[in-house]
Amino acid sequence: MSEALSPDQGLVEQFLDTMWFERGLAENTVASYRNDLSKLLEWMAQNQYRLDFISFAGLQEYQSWLSEQNYKPTSKARMLSAIRRLFQYLHREKVRADDPSALLVSPKLPTRLPKDLSEAQVEALLSAPDPQSPLELRDKAMLELLYATGLRVTELVSLTMENMSLRQGVVRVMGKGGKERLVPMGENAIEWIETFLQQGRSLLLGEQTSDIVFPSSRGQQMTRQTFWHRIKHYAVIAGIDVEKLSPHVLRHAFATHLLNYGADLRVVQMLLGHSDLSTTQIYTHVATERLKQLHNEHHPRA
């Protein structure tokens, strides 16, 4: 028999359910919130606080405690984001008359530029899979689609047949916060997807049926982690330093290379599914740094 939840744990679970069902937060985000908020509840229990009466000063105490635990600034910022959302919810649901988290100050974060690949490196990465193998033909189509669309890895591995129109050349994506967007695929990606659908997909599915466009070797939905391992495998073949990579390396390359060729920032924002333009603007810094590097390497007076 499972252990009964405390009142505070019950409130957190109600909050997480709301984030999941009504706000459309991704499973990974909800799991992260649950983990972060469990730390808060544990600290509160040890210090005789409850969610319905902890004050701003109490939350500041918790913030100080987090600093003493040597968490990275990014981790502390993420934890404070979860706390703010929780207390906004409790205030909205009238569990509390106030929101004690409203004045909490987040740690200052260094600007982190996305890891950048040159066009030549992207070409090498896209050429690494052997399309004679059904598995690598799938990977080739996935890599081409990632670079052509800038999808998030979670959006790619969960892409279904009904959300892709090869005739119209677009994919329909349900992004963060349940926001839907249409993204054009480009001829190259379409050709490789068609080849995979005709020659490789049925071999991976075997006797199983699935609406997932890119099934795993067992005919099921691939995990993000599995695809990340595949990217690293091809990076080694392409002679790319794995340290330069992240799971979203082709999403970053998509955005940076579009901007390098003069794409409008707001168009790139729309294609990436960013709700805030400032999130997209970071790619302009990458593009600028790349231009400076090229200038330094090739200009006679640099």
From Swiss-Prot:
It comes from the Bacteria. Belongs to the 'phage' integrase family. XerD subfamily. It is found in: Cytoplasm. Gene3D superfamilies: 1.10.150.130, Intergrase catalytic core. This is Tyrosine recombinase XerD. GO terms for molecular function: DNA binding; tyrosine-based site-specific recombinase activity. InterPro entries: CB, DNA_brk_join_enz, Integrase-like_cat_sf, Integrase_catalytic, Integrase_recombinase_N, Integrase_SAM-like_N, Recomb_XerD, Tyrosine_recombinase_XerC/XerD. Residues 112-296 form the Tyr recombinase domain. During infection by the bacteriophage CTX-phi, it is required by the bacteriophage, which uses host XerC and XerD proteins to integrate the bacterial genome. Keywords: Cell cycle, Cell division, Chromosome partition, Cytoplasm, DNA integration, DNA recombination, DNA-binding. HAMAP family: Recomb_XerC_XerD, Recomb_XerD. Pfam families: Phage_int_SAM_1, Phage_integrase. GO terms for biological process: cell division; chromosome segregation; DNA recombination; DNA transposition; resolution of DNA recombination intermediates. Forms a cyclic heterotetrameric complex composed of two molecules of XerC and two molecules of XerD.
